[in-house]
């Protein structure tokens, strides 16, 4: 039987613990999920590290939402955040940088990789909006990254199966491809069988209603983007179990 690895995109310490309870091998801890994930706080990383005992902790290093073209100030911030993650005991970090032309930003990536020595490094879904994925794959391998998180440059990994399969063949064991975005208990087995990929990234979240008794629903904390303050999405152990069992059954 193939040895699969499962990473949960965790939006809180609560989600990290649910991932661990469900049998995940690793979590990617992120804040700012509506923006695609941003660097979590010192307190969140530290608490997750204290409470995770069997599940590895990776931390996204992304100073803001939006594109992956970073200013010198943002790069400086990322370097400090990598050092913070290291000091707090993270097992790995997750980042990715592009040039204005959609190429891998090699000078910035080299700087971040140097700062990440001793940590596992995942090049995140900046890969999915790069100009030339085949060329980028070779460059990321040369940089020394351990894995690439990708949906095959599509809205979901299921839609990206053709490119994921081609990239898995091209990689030929030189780097791990981590299939992510829209991976769930209904499609993980298909993605695995059609691509040959053995690592999967998913959120396994469910919507939880707030315990607030008093609610002022006329005010939104998200400005022009409406986010329901009286509902939140958290990973559940049962959905993690279901997703893992779907591929192992």
UniProtKB/Swiss-Prot annotation:
SUPFAM superfamilies: CutC-like. The keyword Heme does not apply. GO terms for molecular function: copper ion binding. Pfam families: CutC (PF03932). Gene3D superfamilies: Copper homeostasis (CutC) domain. It is found in: Cytoplasm. Belongs to the CutC family. This is PF03932 family protein CutC. The gene is cutC.
């Amino acid at each position: 039987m193939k040895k699969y690895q499962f990473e949960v995109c965790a939006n809180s310490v609560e989600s990290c613990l649910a991932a661990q309870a469900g049998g995940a091998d690793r979590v990617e801890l992120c804040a700012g999920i509506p923006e695609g994930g941003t660097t979590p706080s010192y307190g969140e990383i530290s608490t997750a590290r204290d409470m995770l005992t069997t599940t590895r902790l990776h931390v996204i290093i992304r100073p803001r939402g939006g594109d992956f073209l970073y200013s010198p100030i943002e790069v400086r911030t990322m370097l400090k955040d990598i050092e913070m993650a290291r000091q707090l005991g993270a097992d790995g970090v997750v980042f990715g940088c592009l040039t204005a032309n959609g190429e891998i930003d090699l000078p910035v990536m080299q700087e971040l990789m140097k700062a990440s020595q001793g940590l596992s490094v995942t090049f995140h879904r900046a890969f999915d909006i790069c100009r030339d994925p085949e060329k980028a794959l070779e460059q990321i391998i040369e940089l020394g990254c351990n894995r690439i998180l990708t949906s095959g440059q599509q809205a979901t990994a299921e839609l990206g199966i053709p490119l994921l399969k081609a990239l898995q063949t091209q990689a030929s064991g030189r780097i791990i491809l981590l299939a992510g975005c829209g991976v769930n208990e209904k499609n993980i087995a298909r993605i695995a069988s059609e691509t040959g990929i053995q690592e999967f990234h998913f959120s396994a979240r469910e919507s939880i209603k707030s315990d607030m008794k008093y609610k002022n629903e006329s005010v939104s904390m998200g400005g022009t983007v409406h986010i329901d303050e009286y509902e939140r999405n958290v990973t559940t152990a049962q959905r993690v179990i279901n997703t893992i069992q779907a591929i192992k059954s």
